[in-house]
Structures are given as structure tokens and as C-alpha cells.
């Protein structure tokens, strides 16, 4: 039978893992290997994908992929991974004690003043970025779904200016399956850091040590940060740190990154191993007696054959050998082997496969997990089921239930929009508007009393205060929206949304993982585009990038709020929600079009770990809100301020630089009149409206500041309700800001960026025209 045929609660032992290529390798790296025992936890509300437990953690898998995995039913899972009933409470040695790994004066110390460079490497969602913040004093964003870090981040260890530490994207192995794995692997191989800090989730140690073993093979000085030890001990578990050090041959430091416990000791070990270049004491993890020694002999024979090539290419020999056996094409290409050498290696691997009874990739994965099992059996007392896990199961019965998941998601999103636009955000906005209005009146009075020049007076009041002030008044709405998005992300709910939305997204040609960048897109398109780097398929990544501009970003909120309050005051929440919904609908429509034209084929398999629900940290939420508020304020007082002053100048002077009494005679009117015919069919033939939309290409918030300057509070007399609706739809769909286009250019290239800009404007024009025509027919 296959894994697909198992029911909820049933357990089985894996016999064979079908499939081929990078995806199959990814399954093996995640622990889906022959002999592994799995239990089906649940199915998504739409019946696909499934959630299963393997090696002590939860993994999602599509039914189509599960159909390629043959299993045999077992009555219950074995308890061989529980480890000893009790371990000794020997104190963990400090730096230099016992002489195991830090013998004073040993090694070949680096010259004084040479920069110590570190790679911070670990699985996704293991607390890596939290540790980076503790080590460097940075405030990088921390989340509770796989793939928060999508690019490398650099910093110096506090009080050690001669150090440089790089926070790399979270990975499960050194196999090049996803973009983040390629980024992390290339950094370690090409940049050759002086040392590696490998962060391991102590609550999920079996899965995490799989990556650790590959890092040890790279023969780079390394220290292991055993994170979340507080959670292990709180749930009656324990780990013999001294013994695990001896088995792995590197220093192991128990820490809690979230509570900043053990971090100082970790820093001392990290500085020492980098300074003295103390390399791992062990790289050979296959016993020569295991399964007849087939894998052991193969690795050593291949290592001998490629030794000269590996040294010449600068690739660690042991790492290169295991990767070649796995079938890693990138490593094979780097070594430049001749045909005779390739044939000899292939002969060795085929012989090993016959003796071992497993294919090459499965044999290497099994070798690693066998060693990990031996370590855990002798050093780890499994914690009882944690409070977090029990709580997560209870919450999931509702939030990911068969009949409740989709309704709960809709209710949650509606509640977010209602509280943002009608209650909390709107209330705070009103207070800020009163403050800005009072400050404007006070400044106006002071300038008048001082007899300030009329031009300067107009610039300050009509340009800066009226323009920038109108944008600033929308800060509470933006902060409120990000507050709720942050709660959803930190709690782990967004990962669940990806799980139960996968089947729905697959119908439009995407994977459930694409939901994460799209949800981020409701905040800002720039990080949403960057977040697509976590997608394993280039096809999915490109398609998701092209769809993110349809998700209405927070920078458009001031436009919506401005026109909704002016033209639809009694139906604000409904109109706002309708705009967001329209953006999603148009995005889905174009997803179907892209699937049939530019991106034919099926979406890649959905393989994702589901983290436990966690209470969002107040510090992390406040930090995120401050970052977003700071970004908004910086934009308001740079790009928007400059744009506002420029608009004021152009609408106050004619082509001879004489001040005009009627803005119709201004430079701005002359420029904007060129594009007025384009917008006239939309009911937007006023040159001032055209000008505001052009300024929105720089920053969407500029639309409101430009309107305030040009109309001076009389916009309701210049537009009809239908024209306002047409303008709202155009603003929703037209080209994203310069920063977003720049991020698309960085990810896809200039041609794609220009295409996105032109296509979005064309889509917006057509949609606004349809609104206009339908409105006229109904009137």
C-alpha cells in the first residue's frame, strides 16, 4: 500500500520512496526514508494535503506525492527514540575546562586583528534570527513560519568589532533544493567563513542534526548552539550535552535565544574556535560494520578518487564525496572529473547500492539518520508532549478543521479589516487628524503674524502641512493593519493558511507556500517579492511575483480612506473590503491566464513543516510596528515631502515662473493636459487627478498629498460618486511604486519589471472603464 491510503491516526513503516530528482532528495533530507515510521495526523479541509509525523515533527505532503511512497502498516510506532530514562546531571564544562576542545595554546591562531567571520546556519524556524539579534543587537524581524529569512543579513557580535556574522536563510540540508538552500550553501562553500555557528532546535533534535552532520563534513571550525533548552527541561526532557559533544567532536552550548540564556558562553566558544581554527574532531559517521560496511567502503573509495580534484576546487573532500554519491550535479560539475573517473565512481556507487539494498540517495540519508538515532538513544531523554503541542492540536481542531478552516479564515480577515478601517485605525486616525489640524492652524497664524512672504507661506501651509500632513494622518491605519498581520504570523497561523489553502491555490497553478508572499503583499509589495525566494520552484516564484501587485499594499490605504470618507462615509468597511476582494479576484483571473500561457505545467509539490502555535511576543510585535512606522515616516519626510514641494511649485507658477492665481495656468496643468485624454473615458478628465496618479508611481501615499495641494479640500465638487469609484479601482490595480518595481527588477530582470508596470496600468484602465460603463448603465 502507499502512504496516500493511510487514514487519520494510522501508523506505517516506509518501504520505498519513489519519485526522482531534487524533490525526492528533499523528501529524504526531511526524514522520509525507508524504515522511517510515520503517523497520519490529519488531512487539510479540502482533503489534500495531508499532515504526518515523522522523526518527532510534523510535515505536510500532497496526496499525489504520498502515492509514490510505499509503506506497510504497523500497530504502533516503536519507542526506540525515547533514549535513556535518565541521564547524569554533570555540569557542562566551560571554555577551556576538561581540555576536550579548547586546549590552551593549541591550534594555529590567526594573526591579531584579522576579522573573524561566521556563518549562522540552522533549520527553518529554529530561532536563528532571534539568536542573530541577541548576538549583534540588531532588530531583524522574527516570525513563526518557515522561511522568514530570505536573504543573508550581516552584523558584528556585540563588544567584538573585529567579527562579522552572517544570518543565512533557514535550510534543512545542504542539498540545492530551494533558493535559500542555494544561498546558504554557496556562502559556506565560496566565502569560507572562519567558523560556523550551527543553531539546533533542542525540541526537535533528530531533524536538526541531519544538517549538522553535513556541516561537520565541511571541515570548518564549528560550535553548536542547542537552542530552546528551556522548553525541553520545562517538559521533563533532558540532553547529555557533555556526551553529545564527545560524539560529534565539536563544542555544544545549551542556550535559550529568546531569553538570552547561554549566549555569552556561546560567544566565548565561537571566538575561540575561530581564532584557533579548531576544526571538527569527527567527520566519519558511518560505522564500517553497519549493514556490511557497504556505505563506509563506498564513501572512502570515492574520497580517495576525488581528493586531488576536491582540493583544487576548494571543496571539502568528505562533503564532496557524500554529495557525489547522492547525485549532486553541482558538486560533480565543480570537480571537473574526466570520463574514466566518473565511470569508476559510478561503478563504486552501483556496487554499494547492490550490497546495501537501497539506492544511493536513500543509503546516504539512512546512514545519517542511523547515526542520529544512536546519538539520541544515548543522550536524549524525550520531553513529554509539550503544552505548546497540546494547545496547538486543540486550536487546529477549529482553525484547520474540515468544515471550520475556510469560514474561520474569512471571519478573521473580515475582523482585521473591520477593526482596522472602522474601529481602532479609524479612531486613532481621527485623533491624529485633529492634532495635525491644530498644528497647521497654529503655524498658519504664526506665519501670518510674522508677515512671512506669501510664496513661502503658501509652501509651508499649502505644500508641506496640507500635503505631508494628510499622508501622516493615515499612519494609525497602516500600523493597525500590520499589528494584526504580525499577530497572525508570529502565532503560526499563516503557516496553517498555507496548509489548508494549498489545494485551492493548486487550481490556479500555485503551491500553498505562495500564500505567504501574497499575505505579506497586503502589507508591502517589496518584502512580498523578496519572500518568494523561499519557493522551491522558479516557475512558482516568477508567477507569484507577478501576482503580488494585485494584493493591495498598505501604501494604498491613504487613497482608499481619503475617497471612502469623502464619497462613501456610510459604507467604509464594505467598500474597503470590496477593493481588497476585487484585487484578489483579478489576481486569480490572471493566475489562470498565466497558467495557460507563460507558466504551463503543474505547481511543485507542497512540502512544509507546521510549527506549534506560539503566543506572539510583545517585543517582536512592537519592533515590527516601529519598523513599519519608521519606514512610513521616513518616506513621508523624504520622497513624499519632495514630491509635495515639487507639485506645489509646479501648480503655483507658470512656464515664465510667474506666480499664478489659477492653477489651470500653471506648469503642472500644461504637463498633465497631455495625458488627460487617456483618463477621460474613465470619468477622470481633470488634469489634477491625472497629476496625482502620476505622483503615485513614485509612492502611492503621494496621491493623497497631491490631491490636497491641488484641490485644497474641494475634491468632492470635482468628482462624482461614480468617478470616485472608477478612481479607486484604478488606484487598486495600477503599477506599484518605484521601490516595488525595483525589487521586481532585482528578482526577475528589467524586461519583466517594465512589463509589470505597463501591464498593471493597462489592467487598471480596463477595470476602471468597466466600472464606469456598468455604473452609467445602472444609473
Language-model regions, residue ranges each:
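Hydrophobic core segments of alpha-helical transmembrane domains in multi-pass membrane transport
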Residues: 408-419, 481-486, 564-566, 580-593, ...
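Extended, low-charge hydrophobic alpha-helical regions
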Residues: 355, 362-366, 382, 426-464, ...
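Conserved G1/Walker A P-loop phosphate-binding module
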Residues: 92-173
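Juxtamembrane inter-helical linkers in multi-pass membrane proteins
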Residues: 434-442, 495-525, 600-624, 668-670
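Transmembrane helix-loop junctions at the membrane interface of multipass transporters and ion channels
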Residues: 550, 554-577, 739-749, 768-779
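Core alpha-helical transmembrane segments of integral membrane proteins
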Residues: 398-499
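Alpha-helical transmembrane helix bundles of large polytopic membrane transport and channel proteins
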Residues: 223, 233-383
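Conserved C-terminal guanine-recognition region of P-loop GTPase G domains, centered on the G4
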Residues: 160, 185-252, 559
Amino acid at each position: 500500500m502507499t502512504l496516500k491510503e493511510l487514514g487519520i491516526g494510522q501508523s506505517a513503516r516506509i518501504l520505498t520512496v519513489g519519485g526522482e530528482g531534487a524533490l525526492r532528495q528533499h523528501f529524504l533530507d526531511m526524514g522520509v526514508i525507508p524504515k522511517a515510521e510515520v503517523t497520519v495526523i490529519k488531512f487539510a479541509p479540502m482533503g489534500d494535503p495531508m499532515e504526518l509525523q515523522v522523526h518527532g515533527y510534523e510535515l505536510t505532503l500532497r496526496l499525489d506525492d504520498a502515492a509514490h511512497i510505499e509503506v506497510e502498516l504497523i500497530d504502533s510506532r516503536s519507542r526506540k527514540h525515547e533514549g535513556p530514562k535518565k541521564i547524569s546531571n554533570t555540569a557542562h564544562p566551560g571554555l577551556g575546562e576538561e581540555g576536550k576542545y579548547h586546549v590552551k595554546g593549541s591550534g594555529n591562531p590567526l594573526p591579531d586583528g584579522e576579522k573573524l567571520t561566521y556563518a549562522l546556519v540552522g533549520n527553518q524556524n529554529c530561532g536563528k534570527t532571534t539568536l542573530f539579534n541577541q548576538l549583534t543587537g540588531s532588530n531583524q524581524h522574527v516570525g513563526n513560519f518557515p522561511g522568514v529569512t530570505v536573504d543573508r543579513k550581516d552584523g558584528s557580535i556585540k563588544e567584538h568589532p573585529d567579527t562579522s556574522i552572517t544570518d543565512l536563510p533557514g535550510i534543512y540540508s545542504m542539498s540545492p533544493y530551494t533558493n535559500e538552500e542555494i544561498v546558504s550553501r554557496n556562502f559556506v562553500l565560496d566565502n569560507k567563513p572562519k567558523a560556523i555557528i550551527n543553531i539546533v532546535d533542542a525540541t526537535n533534535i533528530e531533524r536538526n542534526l541531519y544538517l549538522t552532520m553535513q556541516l561537520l563534513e565541511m571541515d570548518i571550525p564549528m560550535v553548536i548552539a542547542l537552542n530552546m533548552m528551556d522548553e525541553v527541561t520545562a517538559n521533563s526532557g533532558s540532553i547529555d550535552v557533555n556526551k553529545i559533544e564527545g560524539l560529534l567532536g565539536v563544542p555544544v552550548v545549551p542556550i535559550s535565544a529568546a531569553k538570552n540564556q547561554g549566549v555569552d558562553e556561546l560567544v566565548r566558544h565561537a571566538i575561540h574556535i575561530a581564532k584557533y581554527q579548531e576544526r571538527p574532531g569527527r567527520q566519519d559517521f558511518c560505522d564500517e560494520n553497519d549493514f556490511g560496511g557497504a556505505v563506509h567502503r563506498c564513501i572512502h573509495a570515492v574520497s580517495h578518487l576525488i581528493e586531488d580534484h576536491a582540493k583544487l576546487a576548494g571543496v571539502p573532500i568528505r562533503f564532496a564525496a557524500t554529495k557525489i554519491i547522492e547525485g549532486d550535479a553541482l558538486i560533480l560539475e565543480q570537480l571537473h572529473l574526466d570520463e574514466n573517473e566518473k565511470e569508476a565512481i559510478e561503478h563504486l556507487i552501483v556496487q554499494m547500492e547492490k550490497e546495501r539494498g537501497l539506492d544511493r540517495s536513500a543509503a546516504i540519508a539512512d546512514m545519517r539518520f542511523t547515526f542520529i538515532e544512536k546519538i539520541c538513544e544515548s543522550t536524549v531523554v524525550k520531553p513529554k508532549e509539550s503544552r505548546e503541542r497540546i494547545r496547538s492540536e486543540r486550536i487546529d481542531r477549529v482553525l484547520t478543521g474540515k468544515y471550520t478552516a475556510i469560514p474561520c479564515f474569512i471571519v478573521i480577515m473580515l475582523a482585521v479589516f473591520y477593526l482596522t478601517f472602522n474601529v481602532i485605525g479609524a479612531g486613532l486616525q481621527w485623533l491624529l487628524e485633529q492634532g495635525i489640524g491644530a498644528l497647521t492652524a497654529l503655524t498658519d497664524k504664526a506665519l501670518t503674524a510674522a508677515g512671512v512672504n506669501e510664496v513661502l507661506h503658501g509652501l509651508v501651509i499649502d505644500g508641506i502641512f496640507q500635503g505631508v500632513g494628510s499622508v501622516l494622518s493615515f499612519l494609525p491605519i497602516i500600523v493597525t493593519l500590520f499589528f494584526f498581520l504580525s499577530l497572525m504570523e508570529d502565532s503560526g497561523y499563516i503557516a496553517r493558511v498555507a496548509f489548508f489553502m494549498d489545494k485551492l491555490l493548486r487550481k490556479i497553478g500555485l503551491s500553498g507556500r505562495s500564500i505567504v508572499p501574497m499575505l505579506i503583499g497586503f502589507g508591502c509589495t517589496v518584502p512580498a517579492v523578496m519572500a518568494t525566494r523561499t519557493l522551491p520552484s522558479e516557475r512558482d516564484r516568477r508567477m507569484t511575483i507577478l501576482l503580488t501587485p494585485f494584493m493591495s499594499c498598505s501604501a494604498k490605504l491613504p487613497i482608499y480612506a481619503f475617497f471612502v470618507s469623502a464619497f462613501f462615509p456610510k459604507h467604509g468597511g464594505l467598500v474597503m473590503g470590496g477593493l481588497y476582494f476585487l484585487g484578489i479576484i483579478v489576481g486569480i483571473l490572471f493566475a489562470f491566464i498565466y497558467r495557460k500561457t507563460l507558466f504551463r505545467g503543474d505547481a511543485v509539490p507542497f512540502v512544509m513543516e507546521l510549527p506549534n502555535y506560539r503566543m506572539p511576543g510583545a517585543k517582536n510585535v512592537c519592533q515590527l510596528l516601529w519598523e513599519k512606522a519608521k519606514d512610513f515616516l521616513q518616506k513621508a519626510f523624504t520622497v513624499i515631502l519632495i514630491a509635495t514641494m515639487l507639485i506645489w511649485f509646479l501648480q503655483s507658477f507658470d512656464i515664465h515662473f510667474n506666480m499664478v492665481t489659477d492653477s489651470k495656468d500653471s506648469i503642472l496643468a500644461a504637463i498633465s493636459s497631455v495625458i488627460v485624454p487617456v483618463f477621460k473615458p474613465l470619468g477622470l478628465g481633470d488634469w489634477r487627478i491625472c497629476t496625482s496618479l502620476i505622483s503615485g508611481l513614485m509612492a502611492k501615499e503621494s496621491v493623497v498629498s497631491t490631491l490636497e495641494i491641488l484641490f485644497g479640500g474641494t475634491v468632492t465638487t470635482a468628482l462624482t460618486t461614480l468617478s470616485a469609484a472608477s478612481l479607486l479601482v484604478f488606484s487598486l490595480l495600477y503599477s506599484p511604486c518605484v521601490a516595488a518595481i525595483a525589487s521586481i527588477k532585482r528578482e526577475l530582470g528589467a524586461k519583466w519589471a517594465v512589463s509589470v508596470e505597463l501591464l498593471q496600468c493597462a489592467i487598471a484602465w480596463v477595470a476602471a472603464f468597466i466600472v464606469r460603463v456598468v455604473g452609467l448603465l445602472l444609473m
